[in-house]
């Protein structure tokens, strides 16, 4: 598939902060093959997009999100963090089913794509459902399973390994997996040690 975007203002985000006005950008099989002020005659596009009065730039990255939480939007507003999280959100999350996370994630992804975000980092519940939504939507993501409840049996550790094996570098590398440190107020020392150990063994983060 060859796509040509013409008459578009390109914000390159390079070290010189260069902006190319009324430019042409050509894409072939998902890769940018040229950017120029002039159209190249030897590029025969299957589709042409007129970018007049539009801006083209690298996609935004959401560096911390819980996409499945989209379905809890506006729940328990106007509270301090401790009351909001421990008294309201965590009890509500205990009732969420895997399919709730799947649909909530798809909703969040659609909103991100609509507003220019093309990659995100996510750590939440039922992460296989999050990964499934990412695979279907075509967005890029770095996903982490929640390791807050490591127990003596190593159950969570095994689940994290399985998640890594099932999803890391899937969808032509669009999906990456890592081991998270969500926050210091939810992690105990053993969780940090086990997360670091897993990441080192799998040569990931």
Language-model region placement:
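N-terminal metal-binding scaffold of metallo-dependent hydrolase/deaminase domains
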Residues: 1-43, 54
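Divalent metal-coordination and catalytic microenvironments
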Residues: 8, 25, 30, 53, ...
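Short beta->alpha connector loops
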Residues: 10, 120-127, 185-186
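Extracytoplasmic/periplasmic beta-strand context in beta-sandwich domains
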Residues: 22-24, 47, 177
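Active-site gating loops and adjacent loop-to-helix segments of metal-dependent hydrolytic enzymes
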Residues: 71-103, 137-145, 155
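Hydrophobic alpha-helical hairpins/lids featuring a short glycine-rich hinge
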Residues: 90-125
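Metal-coordinating catalytic core of metallo-dependent amide/deamination hydrolases
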Residues: 130-205
